[in-house]
Amino acid sequence: MWKITAVYLHFIKKKSMKLNVFLYLNKEEKWKQTTGQDEDENMKIIETYGNYIEKWSNENPGRARWLLKTGWKAQNLKFRFAPDKRLMPAEQYLARLMMDTMIRPLERPEESAIVSIFTPCEILQEAGLHPYNVEGFSCYLSASKAERAFLQQAENTGISETLCSYHKTFIGAAQKKVLPKPKCIVYTNLTCDANLLTFKKLAKMYDVPIFAIDVPMQQNEDNVQYVADQLRKLKDFIEECTGKKITDETLTERLRRSKRTLEKFAQYEKESADRYIPADLVTPLYAGMTNNLLLGTEEEETYVDRLLNDVKKAPAKKGKKIYWMHTIPFWSDAVKNELCFQEKAQIVGCELSRVCEPDFDPEKPYEAMARRMVYHALNGSAIRRIEAGICHAKETGADGVVWFGHWGCKHTLGAAQLAKRKFEEQGIPLLILDGDGCDRSHGGEGQTSTRLGAFLEMLNTETDENTDRQEESHDE
């Protein structure tokens, strides 16, 4: 019989100043079910945690990094020993996998490479380099309520307020020396123009080698070969940085695993179309991260294998299914109230988890990775992205789509009206929702609540009207 256990992590600045992070574990290995008052107390703990990270980043960056790592490791204990039972087992596993991915660069930065989200990481994996991702780290800093000081730091040094807040957060944290020096940096110009500023700045700041992959916007075989040639040079670059040899045979096997993983994830989304999958706001983002950064690993294939097993046991569909285009403002109470573990409506897929098709030949590993990049759904004309979104929304059985206009993302903001027209021509209602996936100060919670609530009510009204028409037709 378990007794309630409390783990205290004490961070002492002065005798009168303590920060206690409590991890409650009961006999059923569940988080203690909280009342509204308890939830408020938990939020206060996170706010205090974030405040200390911000404070110590000014006074002692090494201490701030230690606190960041220790808090995340404590959260990982929760994921391992008291997971959220509302999630499918595969998604409980995914939460641990994603947290491991964040912690490792803090523990072993010399074995990590800073990368952009759509960098093909199979070559890095072969050399034992772990992805140290800008967007992922900024998400976790925001979840720790520590992003504001880093955003302000970046802006104070001349970074534009309109630059993507994920990039600004990471730059600010690096400038404050909270984030450790990597082995090297690998990035691509794919989809995000902020990459061109961020990674060059980081390379200069950390004084580490950098490799850029140039991906042309046009989809053709010449461009596939052009990128493949660059990836062969990337192999040489990584070998020089690490002193480890990469063989085409083992790289080919890793690309076979990547292909299987993408195929099985697509199959899962199709099988989930008529099922109820309880969803929070972070799991779709985790899938978007790991299906890019960890593609080719045994861990990511294990995740999709577990998904295929879990979906067969899922109950019949409940409520409305929402497909989400671009990043998700996981911190938003307005979005949580409508879509977090709600039977009335759930996020059933995120664009970022399916940005390329598994139509590549793994026996030609460099061409395979190059094809993924050149034919990436977000590369080139906006219509390609929109058509991919329509296809995937239909496969997941989506009743509606949210097109999230993340602050500073010109690609998404510029295509919003075209996307709305194209989706609705296919019979899929679309809500354009502006906001920020990382920076709470750009929240607009009142507007988000009003517009998202009205959109979901509209979807339900349309269903009721269709049901009434069907009943009238049957009576006639």
Locations of regions flagged by a protein language model:
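Glycine-rich, highly charged phosphate/nucleotide-binding loops
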Residues: 158-175, 378-390
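Hydrophobic alpha/beta core scaffold segments
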Residues: 337-351, 362-372, 376, 381-468
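Acidic/His-rich segments in extracytoplasmic proteins that coordinate ligands and/or metal ions
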Residues: 168-237
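Redox- and metal-dependent alpha/beta enzyme cores, enriched for Fe-S-associated oxidoreductases
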Residues: 117-118, 123-153, 323-394
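A charged, amphipathic alpha-helical module
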Residues: 39, 44-111, 228, 232, ...
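Polybasic, lysine-rich low-complexity intrinsically disordered segments
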Residues: 3-4, 14-18, 30-32
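Short hydrophobic targeting helices and cationic amphipathic motifs
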Residues: 9-11, 23-25
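An N-terminal, globular interaction/scaffold subdomain
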Residues: 92-106, 110-163, 171-175
